From Swiss-Prot:
ClpX-type ZB domain mapped to chain residues: 12-65
GO BP field: cell division; proteolysis involved in protein catabolic process
Organism: Pelodictyon phaeoclathratiforme (strain DSM 5477 / BU-1)
PANTHER family with a match to the protein in the record: ATP-DEPENDENT CLP PROTEASE ATP-BINDING SUBUNIT CLPX-LIKE, MITOCHONDRIAL (PTHR48102:SF7), ATP-DEPENDENT CLP PROTEASE ATP-BINDING SUBUNIT CLPX-LIKE, MITOCHONDRIAL-RELATED (PTHR48102)
Subunit structure: Component of the ClpX-ClpP complex. Forms a hexameric ring that, in the presence of ATP, binds to fourteen ClpP subunits assembled into a disk-like structure with a central cavity, resembling the structure of eukaryotic proteasomes.
Name of the protein in its database record: ATP-dependent Clp protease ATP-binding subunit ClpX
Length: 438
């Protein structure tokens, strides 16, 4: 009776017992005949066969004629006039005209500065400095949307980072190099595109120094992060781990020059209005001037009077404030603005829902009363435009669950009762009204 040999192995008997002998699965040589043997799941290969395979592959590669490389065009962001930038922002962002105008001019000058660097003479005495931007405004006023829309318009890589996740190097959390790693990923690892991208740092007010007094304990997520950000905000060559951070310390670093990266920082800066009002009240003493107050506290116009000293008192260090020369404030959205946000922008949330329903062959309609009710609930929540989607999503989830199964339905009308009480919307099939299917 003969027994088949397991691939790459044979069993031999000796005086000390039975042993397995290993053979190369390609040439048949035993482990004793070669220098090394590499084992796979069901096969073995010796060093001689590896060398032979390598020589064959090298000959095949060399036999292929080289492909002529077309020289790549240098990456050039779209240089759009400030007026065109503002008009484009207006298609997606409702209101905030002062902030849009300020952003449009700052962004235009930033990329114009980049274009002029190549033409600038070495002996030119005038050097245009970088114009990073600080956006100050309540939650849900459009800070992130403005930055995102700018990047889309200019066709440059864009990345968002939450400042609250950042800590000093050596502490648990993300270090500032993570910001650049995310932009590198957004640019598909194209270094030239990365170095002309836009980074939006959200919640920048959360890294304000916790106290005006110098503390003996280290503030690793406040002043320490501000100090770490100074270098990349101003412009420096930073070694960035492509996989992002401290989890892969062995990876090779990619050097990114940040001098042409535009940084837009945004935050609500809750309580800043009180600091400004305090300063204004002191400076106006003796002249009978008073700071006007409203139901929401200080005059909404008060933030427009912000100065660098106010930001310093709030907790930002002077060096950090100096890296953000363009300061723009956003207004609290009123009822009319929120109503317009629901229906006017190109990507308005109601238009998005209508598009989704259209894919199922259903026409979606919101009554005027329903839209008013959405705005009213959003205002009560106090989170600005951000609440609009939350209110609608809470109502629409059940309807979107049912619609794909309602094959004969051609129209769905959302009423005020649907928004307020989650009552059934009005369904239409041809000329007949249908009730909601439970």
């Amino acid at each position: 009776m003969t027994r088949e040999r397991e691939p790459g192995k044979s069993r031999t008997k000796s005086g000390s017992g039975t042993t397995d002998q290993v053979f190369c699965s390609f040439c048949g040589r035993s482990a004793q005949e070669v220098n090394s043997m590499i084992a796979g799941p069901k096969a073995f290969i010796c060093d001689r066969c590896i060398k032979t395979s390598f020589d064959i592959l090298r000959k095949e590669v060399n036999a292929v004629p080289p492909v002529a490389k077309v020289p790549e065009q240098p990456f050039q962001p779209r240089l759009v006039s400030p007026k065109a930038i503002m008009d484009s922002l207006g298609q997606y962002v409702v209101g905030q005209d002062a902030a849009k105008k300020s952003l449009a001019v700052a962004v235009y000058n930033h990329y114009k500065r980049i274009d002029s660097q190549e033409q600038q003479q070495a002996d030119d005495e005038v050097v245009i400095e970088k114009s990073n931007i600080l956006l100050i405004g309540p939650t849900g006023t459009g800070k992130t949307l403005l930055a995102q829309t700018l990047a889309n318009l200019l066709e440059v890589p864009f990345s968002i980072v939450d400042a609250t996740s950042l800590t000093e190097a050596g502490y648990v959390g993300d270090d500032v190099e993570t910001i650049l790693a995310r932009l590198l990923h957004a640019a598909d690892f194209n270094l030239e595109r990365t170095e002309r991208g836009i980074i939006y740092v959200d919640e920048i007010d959360k890294i304000a120094r916790k106290s005006a007094n110098v503390s003996i304990t280290r503030d690793v997520s406040g002043e320490g992060v501000q100090q770490a950000l100074l270098k990349i905000l101003e412009g420096a060559v930073v070694g960035v781990p492509p996989k992002g951070g401290r989890k892969h310390p062995e990876q090779q670093l990619i050097n990114i020059n940040t001098k042409n990266i535009l940084f837009i920082c945004g935050g609500a800066f809750e309580g800043l209005d009180k600091l400004i009002a305090k300063r204004v009240s002191k400076s106006s003493m003796g002249f009978g001037a008073k700071v006007k107050t409203t139901q929401i506290g200080y005059d909404p116009e008060i933030l427009k009077l912000v100065m660098q000293d106010d930001l310093h008192e709030y907790g930002l260090i002077p060096e950090f404030i100096g890296r953000l020369p363009v300061i723009s404030t956003l207004e609290m959205l009123d009822e009319k603005a929120l109503r317009n946000i629901l229906v006017e922008p190109k990507n308005a949330i109601t238009k998005q829902y209508k598009k989704l329903f259209e894919m199922d062959g259903v026409e979606l309609e919101f009554t005027e009363e329903a839209l008013d009710k959405v705005v009213k609930i959003a205002i009560e929540r106090g989170t600005g435009a951000r609440a609009l989607r939350s209110v609608l999503e809470n109502v629409m989830i059940d309807i979107m669950f049912e619609i794909p199964s309602m094959k004969n339905t051609h129209k769905c009308v959302i009423t005020a009762d649907t928004i307020e009480n989650k009552a059934a919307p009005e369904y239409f099939s041809g000329d007949r009204k249908k009730k909601k299917i439970a």
